Design a protein with these regions (language model features):
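Boundary at the C-terminal end of the N-terminal hydrophobic targeting segment
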Residues: 20-24
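Short, P/G- and charge-enriched loop/turn segments at secondary-structure junctions
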Residues: 72-76, 103-107, 216, 297-302
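Short, structured beta-strand segments at or near domain termini in extracellular proteins/domains
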Residues: 306-317
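N-terminal pre-domain segments of enzymes
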Residues: 26-76
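N-terminal export leaders
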Residues: 7-8
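Functional-site microenvironments in short loops/helix caps that host divalent-cation chemistry
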Residues: 94, 98-99, 145-151, 157-298, ...
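A short glycine-rich, aromatic-capped structural motif
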Residues: 77-138, 158-160, 245, 317
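Short capping motifs at secondary-structure boundaries
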Residues: 49, 54, 129-141, 169-175
Length: 317
């Protein structure tokens, strides 16, 4: 992933952004819950005589967990080898960093109007290799840098590779998998917090995989200099692991130097035709803690490969 020091070079290569039309307003979560409750009550009333007639062993199984989205957070998988997904609730948050941080991350309010699902872990080599085995992902087998494959996050992925994976998974499952938007990613990473990290104001190498030796946040021996198996570090309040560090995670958005009045406030991706660069979030094993902040952003060309770049995925509900 290209770091902030080279983003100015990226910016001058991009086509001038087209004015984005505001998306259609999404229904409020409260209205959606009310509608689901009403429909459920009607269905139960209609089927009550039949249900009462069944003996206990014959009673219908509980509905799939994903049907219970309004009731709370839920994990699910669409197939045995599919990524484990976590339902993220709707809500509002302040995206970006305060002026005191002196970063190109201007704060603004964003509304996530409907729940969506995010992979609990970064996509692993096992999951990527399953895509290749099933004639997907362009047959591309990325290098693992000698660190091993298995449950380590897949790296050496371009943004285009990341799009290939979600396209394949969507066809395989018939479900709407995609990359997260920048806003969705930060909302999921923060998990209700307003501090630089979901842990608080600082982060140490026992909490995430990054280069703690570069800024004094940890002893040099804890600079692991490679990825770690996913789930090696604690999950945030939404149940997501490795939102800070391990591998940069490609999102859908085109790269923009900073948020402006054109930046979406509804959680959608900020895209335009012809953009060559895209955004990465989360930082990686080789970055200092400043690059791991929930608001930190980086960018890269859509066909760029790096041992720091991987992905996390989203799914519509």
């Amino acid at each position: 992933m290209i770091t902030r020091r080279t983003l100015a070079l990226l910016a001058v290569t991009f086509l001038a952004p087209a004015a984005a039309e505001a998306g259609a307003a999404k229904p409020k979560l409260e209205a959606r819950i009310g509608e689901l409750k009403a429909k459920t009550a009607a269905l139960v009333a209609a089927q009550r005589p039949h249900l009462d007639a069944l003996s206990p062993p014959q009673r219908l199984a509980a509905p799939p967990a994903i049907w219970r989205v309004p009731g709370g957070l839920t994990d699910f998988k669409d197939c045995s080898r599919c990524p484990q997904m976590v339902v993220i609730p709707a809500g509002e948050f302040t995206m970006g960093s305060p002026p005191s941080d002196k970063q190109a991350e201007t704060q603004h309010r964003v509304t996530i109007a409907a729940p969506f699902a995010v992979s609990k872990f970064e996509i692993t080599f096992d999951q990527w290799d399953d895509c290749v085995k099933n004639r997907g992902c362009g047959g591309y087998r990325p290098e693992d840098e000698g660190w091993g494959r298995g449950k380590r996050p897949v790296v050496n992925l371009s943004w285009e590779n990341a799009r290939d994976y979600v396209s394949w998974l969507s066809v395989k499952t018939g479900k709407p998998y995609r990359l997260l938007s920048e806003a969705e990613w930060e909302y999921a990473a923060r998990a209700g917090t307003t501090t630089p990290f979901w842990f608080g104001a600082t982060i140490v190498p026992s909490q995430a995989n990054f280069d703690g030796s570069t800024d004094g946040s940890g002893p040099s021996e804890l600079n692991r200099q490679k990825t770690m198996p996913v789930g090696s570090f604690p999950a945030n309040a939404f149940g997501l692991h490795d939102m800070h560090g391990n591998a940069w995670e490609w999102v859908e958005d085109c790269w923009h130097d900073d948020y402006t009045a054109k930046a979406p406030t509804d959680g959608s991706a900020w895209v335009e035709d012809g953009c060559r660069g895209h955004v990465g979030r989360g930082g990686s094993w080789e970055d200092s803690q400043s690059e791991l902040r929930s608001s930190a952003r980086s960018g890269g060309f859509k066909d760029e490969l790096s041992s720091t770049d991987g992905l996390r995925i989203a799914r519509g509900l």
